[in-house]
Amino acid sequence: MTPEKINFIQPVESGKPDDFLILSSSWEERCLGVAQRLKSYSCKKILINVYDNSTTKKEEIYKELKNLLKQKGEVQAVNSKQSNPLDGIKRMLYHIKSNFQNVNPKISLDISCFTRKHLLQLLNCLDCNNLLGNTNFYYSQPTEYYTENNSSNAEGIKSICIAETFSGENLSSRDTALIIFLNFEGRRALALWQELQPNVALPIIPFPSVKAGWNEKVQNQNKLLLSTLNLSWEDLEKSSPLNPDDTKELLLRLTSLKPGQNNILKHSNYNFMIAPLGTKPQVLGIFKYCRLFPDKISIAYPSPIKYKDLPESFPTESTWLIDKSINWER
């Protein structure tokens, strides 16, 4: 579907409350974006993911988030570790199943402030449990991103691993092709490429940019990686920063996992790895692609040492309805 900028969140089924609203608290003010747009919205249960490593800023924003939500449904905090969210996902699943006995509850899911790894694993868990078939997905875009000194809020690289539940084929007879989504985290992307040393690397950039000047920021963030790969900006594959279907269709075109496509890489020749360092809507598109081919694709994820406690964060500029799972391929 074409992403739609919205002023107010509507329930999945018009005139009826949702079963669940799921979102994540954060140090980023944009985690308030959906909560600020709930004028006539209501739901039975609100599940707020709350990461560890609490700071004063996180506590202040979380308090404001709860105040915005308390009149819209029963609020339940779900604690999780930012570095390893699987236990938090299990708790989220428990709360959903404890409050809904059938498949495919009506869910509004704000993907804005989950980590990329967490988002992929949460989506996979819900999908495997037949809980994702009636979900509307929202994304809040901030007014700006922190990119001081071509850095981001993710500091250092703690480890590089294949994300649990996303470990695909890895045959010794094949070369490795790394499809790496780039955005404002050039150092993490470079470290990932240096560690994996793939036979083929295909960088993908978010384009067209949502805001003027962001293309230049992405170029500056990833200048060293692109020069190492001997690639110019014009050489790069591009996908929409807001439309998950654009990302899914690009991945289908790049690979040969779907018959009839004019493919760049043949699956029979490569072990495919995807590095999801782009936008959250692109991450949703990656998931939509991976779910079509279970056990074929690996997700490579560079975990940072920590996330900086930044002196400033940026409020929501726009909130988008970016997808509806009722339209997904089954």
Residue locations for each model-derived region?
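Long, low-complexity, Lys/Arg-enriched
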Residues: 1-106, 114-330
